[in-house]
């Protein structure tokens, strides 16, 4: 079966320089899991913060309402708790206090036993000229690949 990727945050790689990645579990309700299995999630504006109780919380991640549920609908943009080891939380809390670092969601996926996981990236924002340099580099690679294919 392997890993089934539900949604990716492609914009994150353009807007941020990813320094390190972490894997975390998510506390979800039943309809949210079913909605994610259908690929109905959006990570674009999401971010993670550690609250006063030392828990990692996921903000602004949109998981659409599951259309076949009949009981209490869940708020699509609700704050969700993330499950990390205490040691990882302390390490992340120290790094997040550094200037310019943020913790952003990169992708949501399901592992073999059916549990939803989220990959988080410790990121530093890119300047406009860094974004332009990255785009030029990607275009150069595409041109080279195109020339190599033509032979």
UniProtKB/Swiss-Prot annotation:
Domain of life: Bacteria
Record key words, sorted: Cytoplasm, RNA-binding
One of the GO BP terms on file: trans-translation
Record-level Gene Ontology MF annotations: RNA binding
Subcellular location: Cytoplasm
Pfam families per the UniProt record, alphabetical: SmpB (PF01668)
CDD domains: SmpB
Principal place of residence: cytoplasm
InterPro entries per UniProt: SmpB, SsrA-bd_prot, SsrA-bd_prot_CS
Chain segments annotated as transmembrane: none
GO cellular component, one term: cytosol
UniProt key word Cytoplasm: yes
HAMAP family tied to this protein: SmpB
Task of the protein: Required for rescue of stalled ribosomes mediated by trans-translation. Binds to transfer-messenger RNA (tmRNA), required for stable association of tmRNA with ribosomes. tmRNA and SmpB together mimic tRNA shape, replacing the anticodon stem-loop with SmpB. tmRNA is encoded by the ssrA gene; the 2 termini fold to resemble tRNA(Ala) and it encodes a 'tag peptide', a short internal open reading frame. During trans-translation Ala-aminoacylated tmRNA acts like a tRNA, entering the A-site of stalled ribosomes, displacing the stalled mRNA.
NCBIfam families: PRK05422.1 (NF003843), smpB (TIGR00086)
Family stated for the protein in its record: Belongs to the SmpB family.
Descriptive protein name: SsrA-binding protein
Organism: Desulfotalea psychrophila (strain LSv54 / DSM 12343)
